[in-house]
């Protein structure tokens, strides 16, 4: 029986490249000359910490980071931007969490959606992935299209497609 796995994985090397390119782009911008800012990727905790002189610069850093993520084919849905808060002397700070893996809530939403499509498919949650099996490969391809059309707040990838 044909099957495939639905996962949500972020390539941390591509994220590291996006952060480094964002730093390089910000260094070349005129409005960031002599500006103090920090953009740090913490691979272990899967988060990005940003500190800037003010909220305007903080928003510009976030926009530049998102542009670089798109350039490296990382979906911006994997970034969970927290609200900015003020630290000493008017500097603004925020933390961006990188969503990696499917949570139980998201996985259950996806399986409910699959069941609601009335396609002859079985889905099972296996840790941080969902295994979908069906009698025809066409049904699997159709569910891939339908899942891409939905918004589950995480980027979805399809792996291990077997005939």
Swiss-Prot record:
It comes from Dehalococcoides mccartyi (strain ATCC BAA-2266 / KCTC 15142 / 195). InterPro entries: DUF520 (IPR007551), UPF0234-like_C (IPR035571), UPF0234_N (IPR035570), YajQ-like_sf (IPR036183). This is Nucleotide-binding protein DET1318. Transmembrane segments: none annotated. PANTHER family: UPF0234 PROTEIN YAJQ (PTHR30476:SF0). Keywords: Nucleotide-binding. Nucleotide-binding protein. Disulfide bonds: none annotated. It comes from the Bacteria. The keyword Nucleotide-binding applies. The keyword Nucleotide-binding applies. Pfam families: DUF520.
């Amino acid at each position: 029986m044909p099957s495939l796995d639905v996962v949500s994985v972020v390539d941390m090397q591509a994220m590291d490249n996006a952060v480094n390119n964002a730093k390089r782009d910000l260094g070349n911008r005129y409005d960031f000359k002599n500006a103090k800012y920090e953009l740090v990727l913490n691979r272990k905790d899967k988060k990005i910490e940003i500190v800037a002189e003010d909220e305007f610069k903080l928003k510009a850093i976030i926009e530049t980071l998102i542009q670089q993520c798109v350039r490296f084919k990382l979906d911006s849905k994997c970034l969970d931007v927290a609200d900015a808060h003020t630290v000493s002397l008017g500097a603004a700070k925020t933390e961006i969490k990188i969503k990696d893996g499917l949570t139980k809530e998201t996985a259950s939403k996806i399986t409910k959606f699959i069941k609601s499509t009335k396609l002859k498919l079985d889905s099972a949650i296996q840790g941080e992935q969902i295994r979908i099996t069906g009698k025809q490969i066409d049904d699997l391809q159709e569910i891939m299209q339908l899942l891409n059309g939905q918004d589950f707040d995480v980027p979805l990838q399809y792996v291990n497609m077997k005939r």
